[in-house]
Structures are given as structure tokens and as C-alpha cells.
Amino acid sequence: LFPQVFNGQLFFTNTSSNGLTDFENFLTGNVQFSFGGGGVYNHTYRQNDSAVFVQDNWKATKNLTLNMGLRTEFLGAWTDGACHIGNIESDLTKSGTYPFIYPSCANKLGVSGLTGNAAGSTFNNSVATGLGPRLGFAWDVFGRHSTTLRGGYGIYYDREDIGAVDQLSFQSPFIPIVFFPGTGLANFFAGASPLLNPNAVPPAGTLSSAWVPCLARLVSFTPNNPAGDGSYACTGGPGVNSTQNLFVLEVPRHFRVPNTQQWNLTVQQELGKNWVLEVGYVGTRGIHLRETRDGIQSVNATPQNPFTVTDVNGNHYTITNNTFSNAIARTPTPGLNGYSGYQIFANDAYSIYHSLQTTLSRRWGSNYLQAAYTFSKNIDATSSGNTAFNTAYNDQSNINASRGLSDFDRQHRLAVTYVYQIPAFQHSKGLLHAALGNWAVSGVSIFQSGTPFSILDSGSGDAFLGLGSTPLLGASLAPGASIPSGLTSGSLQSRVAKGYLNPAAFTPASLLYYPNISASECSAPTGPDPSGNTCVTGFGNLGRNIYRGPREQNWDTSLIKFFKIGERNEVRFTADFFNVWNHANFANPAFTDVEVGSAFGKIFNSTGTP
């Protein structure tokens, strides 16, 4: 289980300091950060769900039918029969309270310093209850079956999958995680205590008291000193593994499950003989959706908004600038590492979908034609339930900073489906009928918008987030540029050949203190700050998913031949032709990180058929 954790992982990213892409850094062995863990990995996960419902169909009048129902869900939180999970309540550190939460069964594990008093799920409530009403109607408006109005509304709950409890299994001392710059991987399996080596992890299958966490306390600190990061002591709590060196994972202790509201209103109108038109509005709203982020990222300290820290003796220190060294001290929850050692797995994301959906269809004889067009917009705070990396964009302290078009949004989509019985030679006889009669053609043709994408800067935000904390950091517009100017012009073929994006329209996020020079100049010995400690970047000013990839189309066609066998049987021969025009659908630009150099904004791949 979790081989990627116990074997360790190396990560290669795009880097501005040497101008290399992630793959080039891989080829040269230039590791940006590493990840690994050890400990116990056996679990006995359990979850209990139940539901009751009532439902009835009522024909209120001869023209109106109602469908009504109510479903009540009782969705249980996951527990672990092996008791190898733990949680953390980060806000407790603000009052100096030990933040780690373990189930009461942890007292039976016989590990010195490991105690628990929480429920088996570690949550305050172990069951989430939800009411799911259902209401639908169908109305024959004029009583002639030519005009029908249909509508419906419902709330639907989604049982939480195993992801949440998996997060809890990575808590120290069960599977301590270390997440350090690349050179730290060399010491992962040294076998030393974390007191001697902060990168050490326990051997696989070992549950050791050496990795029971304690809450770190600030002992001394020199504010606004670029080279000073303060010193910490392990004084808070029963353990010895200091939290400023730990990667901790939090799941909010109020258990809730995602739910979706869906509604629709559609009118169906008969248009002459065999033609039917449907026009409808369909909407969906999701709340309590899963997301992962660093909710306690290092704060922005300025002379106008200073940040004050307090040491174990009650001395106060005021921070008015942002450096790499004081990043952990700028964590809003004292003692934790909000710079690169924390992830929250929360159900506080959301989504909203609105659409106009139309369908025009006709049936005549054995023939059929349908054209379905959708004009829609899907917005969310995050489009992924990834549990390994943060899914929020840019500022991790505010989930609304990630609001944008969904990764899978397609503004326009037209699908045409048809079956056509070729009338020629239908009534011929003999060999002519056998060879040329009873042929048909069918197919599906799809035309749709491309999917959205963002312009990224892997070097941005390092004043607030450590390397590897999130893959979704935005770049900035270049001075004088606009969002439309970020796209090149011309035919799609020419843009694929020369570049889909205009590199001159974008720039890496600015340095907080030296906005007019590049990060590489700042870190050079001759730069404004030879130590490099104040050469930190803020977040870019570009939003999430502001551009859209190439539109797509596809034609699939079938040629069908029927052979009659007697009066009641037939044999059908079908030849299928996929992408019959051999039309290439191009993927989004392969590299949208402004740090990658000449590969930026170019399309190198095609995508599958829509």
C-alpha cells in the first residue's frame, strides 16, 4: 500500500534560476523537492450508510402529472478498525493547545505518548444527515399532446469516498511524511531518530514513539533578519517529533458530504409532421465539494500590516517583511509549518452550471435525424478531488481565489445523429436488388469548444508557499498587454505551427521587493540582496482558466447493408468509419508555464475524438 510513499519520490519542476523545464531538470538530475514516508500501512476501513425514502406519482388532472418524493440519507464517516489514523485541529495552536486528535482506541496501541479521546472517525459528528427532496411534473399544456412542459428539482447527496480517511492515515506517528528540498532524500532511510535527522522516517511496519508529534514553540527570533529563521523547542504536548519539521494533514472535524442541487425546465413542441423541438434550461449547483490546499500558508507581513509572533517566554516579535527564512514563523497557526508542511482536505468547494439545451428531431419511416445543441457555462472553485496535491489556485488562504471556468467546461457543443435508409433500388428485384438495395447510412458528428486552461508560473508565490506545495500558481500579464493579446492570430494550423500563445504578453510574478528585475538577477551575488532571502515572489495577477484551447470536431459514419432472410429475419453488415475526414483535433498547449522558455504556448499533441 502506498508504494510511492515508502519508496520515496523525487519531483522535477520548471525553474527560473536556470531556465530549465521540468524534463530538462530530470535529465540533469536537478531535483527540486522530495517526498517520502514510513511507518504502518495496514488499515481496516469501515463505513456505514443508510437511507429511507418515500415517493409517489400523482395524476392531478388528465393533463398534469406530478412526481414527488423525499429521501433522507444517513451517511457515516470512515473509521479504521486498526486505529492507524489521526487528525489535527490547527486553530488550537493559537491558544497553545496541543492540536493532534486521535481516536480513543489509540490508547490500546501501547505507544508511549500516544493518547486519544476522540470518536473512531476523529470527527465531532460521525454521521452526516441530509434531506433530498424530489419534485417533477409533466403538463400537456393544451391537451392535444403537441405542447408539453416538463420540470424538476432535486437534491442529491454523494457518499464520501476513501480519500478523507486516507488523509488521516498519513498522520504522524502512523505514516510520518517528510517533504523537503531534493537533497533531503538522501537521509530518508538513515534510520536515525527525528531528533537527530528531521528527514528520518520509521522503517515500514514500525509504529514508534519517536515519531509521536509535539507542538513546536518559538524559543528565540530576530525579526526582519533575512538570515534568521528563529529557533524552536519541542515543549507542547506528549511527543518528541517537532511539528515545524512535520508534514501534517487536516480534515475539518465537522463531517459533511457533498451534495448537488439539480433543476430543469423544458418545453417540447411538435412542429408539423414528425418534427419535434425541445428547448430547456438545466442547472446544477454543488456545495461541500472536496478540495485540498494549504489553508495556513505564510501570511504577507508588511510595515502596514505587521505580523507578531510570541516565543515560549512571552516575548513578542514583529515581522514586517517576507523572507524564506521567516516563512515558517509567518504561519498563522503557531508551531505548524504553513509554508511547506500542511494540507487541509476540506469539503468547502463549490460549483455552478447553467445551460440552454435544445434538441430538434425527426422520425420518418426507418429514418431518424436529431441535432442537439448545448450552450453552457460551468464554474467552480476547483475541478479536481486530488488528494495528493493542492487543487486550489494561487492564494491558498482563500478558496474564492480559485473561482473560474471548470477545467472541463465546453461553452458550445453540437451533436448530430442520423440514420438514413437509401431509397434507391428499394423496389428493384433480382440481382440488382440484392447488390444495390437495402443500404443505409448512419453517423454521429460532433462539434464543440475547447477546454479552458491557465497561464502558470511555477516560481510565483514563494513568499507564502514552499516549493512543491501546489502545481497551480498563476503568472502575470506583461506591462501594456491584455488578456486578448495573449492569443496569437491566424488559422489554427498556423497557430499550431508557430505557437498558440503570445509569450510577450506574459511575465513571471513580480518579486515583492524588486519588481523591476527578474528572480535570477535577484538571487545572483551581484544582485540587490546577495543573501537572496528577500528575493521572494508574490502571486501572479492572472486568474484561473482564462483561455480556451482549440475547438474540436469529429465525424463517425457507418455504411449498413441489410440482407433479408425470409419474411421475418435479416442479416446486417456494417462498415464503421471513425473520424472519416481524418481531421486532427489539437490538444491545449503542452506548456503554459512562463518559466519553460521557448516551449511555452506551443501545441505538440493531438487529443482524442470528442
Protein language model regions, located:
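Short, solvent-exposed turn/loop segments enriched in Gly/Ser/Thr/Pro and often Arg
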Residues: L1, L70-C83, G152-E160, V282-R285, ...
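Surface-exposed extracellular loop regions of Gram-negative outer-membrane beta-barrel proteins
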Residues: S146-L185, I287-R293, V441-F447, T451
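Short, well-ordered alpha-helical packing segments
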Residues: A51, N57, G69, G132-W139, ...
